[in-house]
Protein backbone atom coordinates (compact mmCIF):
# COMPACT_ATOMS: atom_id res chain seq x y z
CA UNK A 1 0.00 0.00 0.00
CA UNK A 2 1.14 3.54 -0.66
CA UNK A 3 2.18 5.12 2.65
CA UNK A 4 0.65 8.42 1.53
CA UNK A 5 -2.69 6.80 0.76
CA UNK A 6 -2.57 4.87 4.01
CA UNK A 7 -1.82 7.89 6.20
CA UNK A 8 -4.49 10.24 4.83
CA UNK A 9 -8.10 10.11 6.03
CA UNK A 10 -10.91 9.12 3.68
CA UNK A 11 -13.91 11.04 5.04
CA UNK A 12 -16.17 10.11 2.14
CA UNK A 13 -14.66 6.82 1.00
CA UNK A 14 -12.48 6.46 -2.08
CA UNK A 15 -14.82 6.21 -5.08
CA UNK A 16 -17.35 9.02 -5.30
CA UNK A 17 -19.59 9.44 -8.33
CA UNK A 18 -20.35 12.96 -9.52
CA UNK A 19 -23.92 12.04 -10.35
CA UNK A 20 -25.76 13.31 -13.43
CA UNK A 21 -29.17 14.90 -13.00
CA UNK A 22 -31.81 13.00 -15.03
CA UNK A 23 -34.40 15.02 -16.93
CA UNK A 24 -37.65 13.76 -18.38
CA UNK A 25 -39.00 14.49 -21.87
CA UNK A 26 -40.32 17.86 -20.67
CA UNK A 27 -36.97 18.89 -19.23
CA UNK A 28 -38.05 18.48 -15.61
CA UNK A 29 -35.87 16.72 -13.05
CA UNK A 30 -36.82 13.04 -13.05
CA UNK A 31 -36.68 12.37 -9.33
CA UNK A 32 -37.79 8.74 -9.58
CA UNK A 33 -35.04 7.93 -12.08
CA UNK A 34 -32.53 9.80 -9.94
CA UNK A 35 -33.33 7.51 -7.03
CA UNK A 36 -32.93 4.38 -9.16
CA UNK A 37 -29.67 5.64 -10.65
CA UNK A 38 -28.31 6.46 -7.20
CA UNK A 39 -28.97 2.94 -5.96
CA UNK A 40 -27.40 1.46 -9.09
CA UNK A 41 -24.23 3.53 -8.68
CA UNK A 42 -23.83 2.32 -5.11
CA UNK A 43 -24.39 -1.27 -6.22
CA UNK A 44 -21.64 -0.77 -8.80
CA UNK A 45 -19.06 0.25 -6.22
CA UNK A 46 -19.50 3.91 -5.35
CA UNK A 47 -18.75 4.72 -1.72
CA UNK A 48 -20.58 8.00 -2.06
CA UNK A 49 -22.42 10.29 -4.43
CA UNK A 50 -21.99 13.96 -5.23
CA UNK A 51 -25.34 15.53 -6.11
CA UNK A 52 -25.68 18.83 -7.97
CA UNK A 53 -22.03 19.30 -8.85
CA UNK A 54 -20.64 20.16 -12.28
CA UNK A 55 -21.73 16.82 -13.73
CA UNK A 56 -25.14 17.31 -12.12
CA UNK A 57 -25.63 20.58 -14.06
CA UNK A 58 -25.93 22.73 -10.95
CA UNK A 59 -25.75 26.02 -12.91
CA UNK A 60 -29.10 25.27 -14.58
CA UNK A 61 -30.90 23.80 -11.56
CA UNK A 62 -32.94 25.99 -9.26
CA UNK A 63 -32.14 25.81 -5.56
CA UNK A 64 -35.53 24.18 -5.03
CA UNK A 65 -34.70 21.48 -7.59
CA UNK A 66 -31.34 20.92 -5.92
CA UNK A 67 -32.84 20.48 -2.47
CA UNK A 68 -35.49 18.08 -3.81
CA UNK A 69 -32.89 16.03 -5.66
CA UNK A 70 -30.64 15.84 -2.62
CA UNK A 71 -33.52 14.62 -0.48
CA UNK A 72 -34.49 11.92 -2.98
CA UNK A 73 -30.92 10.63 -3.33
CA UNK A 74 -30.38 10.71 0.42
CA UNK A 75 -33.49 8.59 0.95
CA UNK A 76 -32.71 6.25 -1.95
CA UNK A 77 -29.27 5.15 -0.79
CA UNK A 78 -29.83 5.08 2.95
CA UNK A 79 -27.53 6.08 5.80
CA UNK A 80 -24.63 3.79 4.90
CA UNK A 81 -23.65 5.77 1.80
CA UNK A 82 -22.03 9.19 1.84
CA UNK A 83 -24.01 11.87 0.01
CA UNK A 84 -22.39 15.22 -0.72
CA UNK A 85 -24.31 18.23 -1.97
CA UNK A 86 -22.86 20.72 -4.41
CA UNK A 87 -23.50 24.00 -2.60
CA UNK A 88 -21.06 26.39 -4.22
CA UNK A 89 -21.92 29.80 -5.58
CA UNK A 90 -20.11 32.99 -6.50
CA UNK A 91 -22.32 34.66 -3.89
CA UNK A 92 -21.11 33.85 -0.39
CA UNK A 93 -24.58 34.43 1.05
CA UNK A 94 -26.11 31.97 -1.44
CA UNK A 95 -23.43 29.38 -0.74
CA UNK A 96 -24.03 29.68 3.00
CA UNK A 97 -27.77 29.25 2.56
CA UNK A 98 -27.32 26.23 0.27
CA UNK A 99 -24.83 24.62 2.63
CA UNK A 100 -26.99 25.03 5.72
CA UNK A 101 -29.98 23.69 3.76
CA UNK A 102 -27.94 20.67 2.68
CA UNK A 103 -27.07 19.95 6.29
CA UNK A 104 -30.74 20.16 7.21
CA UNK A 105 -31.71 17.71 4.44
CA UNK A 106 -29.19 15.16 5.71
CA UNK A 107 -26.13 15.56 3.50
CA UNK A 108 -22.92 14.00 4.79
CA UNK A 109 -20.85 16.78 3.30
CA UNK A 110 -20.80 19.69 0.90
CA UNK A 111 -18.77 20.16 -2.27
CA UNK A 112 -18.05 23.89 -2.39
CA UNK A 113 -16.58 25.20 -5.63
CA UNK A 114 -14.28 28.19 -5.94
CA UNK A 115 -16.43 31.25 -6.75
CA UNK A 116 -16.68 31.68 -10.50
CA UNK A 117 -16.70 34.73 -12.78
CA UNK A 118 -16.00 37.39 -10.13
CA UNK A 119 -12.39 36.14 -9.67
CA UNK A 120 -11.75 37.04 -6.03
CA UNK A 121 -8.17 37.32 -4.72
CA UNK A 122 -6.84 34.72 -2.31
CA UNK A 123 -7.92 36.83 0.66
CA UNK A 124 -11.47 36.89 -0.70
CA UNK A 125 -11.45 33.14 -1.34
CA UNK A 126 -10.29 32.52 2.21
CA UNK A 127 -13.01 34.76 3.65
CA UNK A 128 -15.63 33.10 1.42
CA UNK A 129 -14.82 29.52 2.44
CA UNK A 130 -14.26 30.44 6.08
CA UNK A 131 -17.72 32.04 6.26
CA UNK A 132 -19.32 28.91 4.77
CA UNK A 133 -17.42 26.59 7.12
CA UNK A 134 -18.40 28.64 10.16
CA UNK A 135 -22.06 28.79 9.09
CA UNK A 136 -22.34 24.98 9.02
CA UNK A 137 -19.69 23.83 11.50
CA UNK A 138 -20.99 20.26 11.78
CA UNK A 139 -20.96 19.61 8.01
CA UNK A 140 -17.67 18.37 6.49
CA UNK A 141 -16.59 20.40 3.47
CA UNK A 142 -14.79 19.41 0.29
CA UNK A 143 -13.22 22.45 -1.35
CA UNK A 144 -13.39 22.24 -5.14
CA UNK A 145 -10.71 23.78 -7.33
CA UNK A 146 -11.44 23.76 -11.06
CA UNK A 147 -9.77 26.87 -12.53
CA UNK A 148 -10.64 25.96 -16.10
CA UNK A 149 -14.29 26.65 -15.26
CA UNK A 150 -14.07 29.25 -12.50
CA UNK A 151 -11.39 31.59 -13.81
CA UNK A 152 -9.32 31.53 -10.62
CA UNK A 153 -7.48 28.98 -8.52
CA UNK A 154 -7.44 28.27 -4.79
CA UNK A 155 -3.80 28.30 -3.68
CA UNK A 156 -2.48 25.53 -1.41
CA UNK A 157 -1.33 28.12 1.13
CA UNK A 158 -4.89 29.43 1.33
CA UNK A 159 -6.19 25.90 1.84
CA UNK A 160 -3.71 25.42 4.68
CA UNK A 161 -5.10 28.49 6.45
CA UNK A 162 -8.66 27.27 5.89
CA UNK A 163 -7.83 24.03 7.67
CA UNK A 164 -8.08 26.04 10.88
CA UNK A 165 -11.79 25.33 10.37
CA UNK A 166 -12.30 21.77 11.68
CA UNK A 167 -14.87 20.91 9.02
CA UNK A 168 -12.57 21.70 6.08
CA UNK A 169 -11.51 18.10 5.57
CA UNK A 170 -11.08 17.43 1.86
CA UNK A 171 -10.25 18.90 -1.52
CA UNK A 172 -11.27 18.03 -5.07
CA UNK A 173 -8.28 18.65 -7.32
CA UNK A 174 -9.40 19.41 -10.87
CA UNK A 175 -6.65 21.64 -12.19
CA UNK A 176 -5.36 18.88 -14.45
CA UNK A 177 -1.98 18.37 -12.80
CA UNK A 178 -0.59 15.98 -10.20
CA UNK A 179 1.57 18.80 -8.86
CA UNK A 180 -1.54 20.26 -7.22
CA UNK A 181 -1.69 17.19 -4.97
CA UNK A 182 1.99 17.49 -4.11
CA UNK A 183 1.73 21.17 -3.23
CA UNK A 184 -1.36 20.56 -1.10
CA UNK A 185 0.41 17.82 0.84
CA UNK A 186 3.46 20.02 1.36
CA UNK A 187 1.31 22.87 2.67
CA UNK A 188 -1.41 20.92 4.50
CA UNK A 189 0.18 17.63 5.45
CA UNK A 190 -1.67 14.32 5.41
CA UNK A 191 -4.78 15.49 7.28
CA UNK A 192 -6.37 16.91 4.13
CA UNK A 193 -8.03 14.22 2.00
CA UNK A 194 -7.32 15.09 -1.63
CA UNK A 195 -9.55 13.56 -4.30
CA UNK A 196 -8.75 13.56 -8.00
CA UNK A 197 -11.34 15.43 -10.03
CA UNK A 198 -10.23 13.67 -13.20
CA UNK A 199 -10.67 9.93 -13.84
CA UNK A 200 -7.64 9.85 -16.10
CA UNK A 201 -5.43 11.24 -13.34
CA UNK A 202 -6.74 9.03 -10.55
CA UNK A 203 -3.85 6.57 -10.53
CA UNK A 204 -1.11 9.22 -11.02
CA UNK A 205 -2.65 11.37 -8.28
CA UNK A 206 -2.91 8.44 -5.87
CA UNK A 207 0.78 7.79 -6.44
CA UNK A 208 1.55 11.24 -4.98
CA UNK A 209 -0.95 11.13 -2.13
CA UNK A 210 -4.55 11.49 -3.32
CA UNK A 211 -7.00 9.19 -1.53
CA UNK A 212 -9.57 8.64 -4.27
CA UNK A 213 -11.63 10.24 -7.00
CA UNK A 214 -14.78 12.19 -7.67
CA UNK A 215 -15.59 10.28 -10.83
CA UNK A 216 -17.66 10.69 -13.97
CA UNK A 217 -16.69 7.36 -15.54
CA UNK A 218 -18.03 5.44 -12.54
CA UNK A 219 -21.50 5.85 -14.01
CA UNK A 220 -20.33 3.20 -16.48
CA UNK A 221 -17.33 1.35 -15.00
CA UNK A 222 -17.68 1.70 -11.25
CA UNK A 223 -16.57 -1.83 -10.49
CA UNK A 224 -13.43 -1.50 -12.60
CA UNK A 225 -12.49 1.80 -10.99
CA UNK A 226 -13.00 0.30 -7.55
CA UNK A 227 -10.82 -2.65 -8.57
CA UNK A 228 -8.10 -0.28 -9.79
CA UNK A 229 -8.10 1.62 -6.50
CA UNK A 230 -8.00 -1.58 -4.46
CA UNK A 231 -5.22 -3.03 -6.58
CA UNK A 232 -3.10 0.07 -6.01
CA UNK A 233 -3.77 0.09 -2.27
CA UNK A 234 -2.90 -3.61 -2.05
CA UNK A 235 0.47 -3.06 -3.69
CA UNK A 236 -0.56 -4.57 -7.03
CA UNK A 237 0.83 -1.76 -9.13
CA UNK A 238 0.92 -3.67 -12.41
CA UNK A 239 -2.73 -4.66 -12.08
CA UNK A 240 -3.74 -1.10 -11.23
CA UNK A 241 -1.82 0.15 -14.25
CA UNK A 242 -3.55 -2.35 -16.51
CA UNK A 243 -6.95 -1.01 -15.41
CA UNK A 244 -5.72 2.55 -15.90
CA UNK A 245 -4.62 1.82 -19.46
CA UNK A 246 -7.70 -0.24 -20.27
CA UNK A 247 -10.00 2.61 -19.26
CA UNK A 248 -8.14 5.45 -20.99
CA UNK A 249 -10.28 5.38 -24.18
CA UNK A 250 -13.42 5.82 -22.08
CA UNK A 251 -11.88 8.59 -19.98
CA UNK A 252 -11.00 10.49 -23.14
CA UNK A 253 -14.38 9.83 -24.78
CA UNK A 254 -16.22 11.26 -21.77
CA UNK A 255 -14.41 14.58 -22.16
CA UNK A 256 -14.39 14.91 -25.94
CA UNK A 257 -16.65 17.90 -25.33
CA UNK A 258 -18.06 19.66 -22.29
CA UNK A 259 -18.99 17.45 -19.34
CA UNK A 260 -21.71 16.16 -18.77
CA UNK A 261 -22.73 16.02 -22.44
CA UNK A 262 -20.84 12.78 -23.24
CA UNK A 263 -21.66 10.90 -20.03
CA UNK A 264 -25.37 11.60 -20.43
CA UNK A 265 -25.15 10.24 -23.98
CA UNK A 266 -23.24 7.20 -22.72
CA UNK A 267 -25.91 6.52 -20.12
CA UNK A 268 -28.61 6.78 -22.77
CA UNK A 269 -26.66 4.30 -24.92
CA UNK A 270 -26.43 2.03 -21.87
CA UNK A 271 -30.18 2.02 -21.25
CA UNK A 272 -30.52 4.86 -18.76
CA UNK A 273 -32.92 7.52 -20.17
CA UNK A 274 -31.37 10.45 -18.32
CA UNK A 275 -32.31 12.95 -21.01
CA UNK A 276 -30.35 15.70 -22.69
CA UNK A 277 -28.52 18.43 -20.79
CA UNK A 278 -30.30 21.71 -20.25
CA UNK A 279 -29.44 24.69 -22.40
CA UNK A 280 -26.98 26.20 -23.01
CA UNK A 281 -25.52 22.68 -23.21
CA UNK A 282 -26.65 20.56 -26.13
CA UNK A 283 -26.94 16.81 -26.79
CA UNK A 284 -23.85 15.06 -28.12
CA UNK A 285 -23.59 15.43 -31.88
CA UNK A 286 -24.16 12.29 -34.01
CA UNK A 287 -20.53 11.81 -35.04
CA UNK A 288 -19.30 11.97 -31.45
CA UNK A 289 -22.18 9.78 -30.33
CA UNK A 290 -21.22 7.07 -32.83
CA UNK A 291 -17.60 7.22 -31.67
CA UNK A 292 -18.72 6.98 -28.05
CA UNK A 293 -20.89 3.98 -28.87
CA UNK A 294 -17.89 2.27 -30.45
CA UNK A 295 -15.80 2.99 -27.35
CA UNK A 296 -18.47 1.49 -25.09
CA UNK A 297 -18.76 -1.58 -27.30
CA UNK A 298 -15.00 -2.12 -27.29
CA UNK A 299 -14.89 -1.71 -23.51
CA UNK A 300 -17.52 -4.41 -23.07
CA UNK A 301 -15.24 -6.81 -24.95
CA UNK A 302 -12.28 -6.33 -22.59
UniProtKB/Swiss-Prot annotation:
Functional pathway: Amino-acid biosynthesis; L-lysine biosynthesis via DAP pathway; (S)-tetrahydrodipicolinate from L-aspartate: step 3/4
UniProt xrefs under CDD domains: DHDPS (cd00950)
Keyword tags: Amino-acid biosynthesis, Cytoplasm, Diaminopimelate biosynthesis, Lyase, Lysine biosynthesis, Schiff base
PROSITE patterns linked to this entry: DHDPS_1, DHDPS_2
Family: Belongs to the DapA family.
Quaternary structure annotation from Swiss-Prot or TrEMBL: Homotetramer; dimer of dimers.
Name of the featured protein: 4-hydroxy-tetrahydrodipicolinate synthase
Gene source species: Prochlorococcus marinus (strain MIT 9303)
This protein's encoding gene: dapA
Amino acid sequence: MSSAAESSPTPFGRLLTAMVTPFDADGCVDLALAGRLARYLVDEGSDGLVVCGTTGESPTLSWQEQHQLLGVVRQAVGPGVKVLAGTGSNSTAEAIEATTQAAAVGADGALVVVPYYNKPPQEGLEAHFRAIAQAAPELPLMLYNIPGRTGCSLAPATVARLMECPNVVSFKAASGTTDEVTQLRLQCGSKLAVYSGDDGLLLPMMSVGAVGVVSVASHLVGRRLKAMIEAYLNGQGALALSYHEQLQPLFKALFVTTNPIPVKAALELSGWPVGSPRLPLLPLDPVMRDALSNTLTALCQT
